[in-house]
Amino acid sequence: TFFTMFTGIYTVPLEKTETGFAKNVIILIPDGMSTDGVTLTRWVYNDGRPLNMDEIASGLVRTHNSDTIIADSAPGGTALATGHKTQDKLRGIKPKKAVLYASDKNDEKDYYSPVASVLELAKSMGKSTGIIATSEIMHATPADFTAHATHRSNYNDITEQQVFQNLDVVFGGGEFFLKAEN
């Protein structure tokens, strides 16, 4: 799944530069892509030369679950969207179990409570927001920015939340879940 989320949120650099402040943010998430896979692509398909994507500013983050070292797309996307690690299958909500480093320890009253995403923050600031996905928009990573659910497969609930997010642009699959009869 390849996923893009964009916002009109302003970023604040540590120091003001001569060029000013960023006006817009576009986040590209090639879900499941690894540095090893990119390196192999350079060597096999591009004779070791840089790829076009190498010109894009990028970074790496640790998106392990709150309770296991390997994350699937839903908790991995939640970590990217909210800055909070969560458990397998959860999206956009606090975990019940948080035992690994960099995981928030929650009080029992906070289990499964929603955490705001960067997209929701941008919308609350009056910015234009949107998501673009090569999968269904209610799939794991795109939905981490636009919904809160106790299971990544709750497509009907997730879709309803996405409709009421008032996104300005939405491109992706999932038409079946957007029809009124479903």
Task: Tell where the protein language model's regions lie, with residue ranges.
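Double-stranded DNA-binding cores of transcription factors and transposases
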Residues: T7
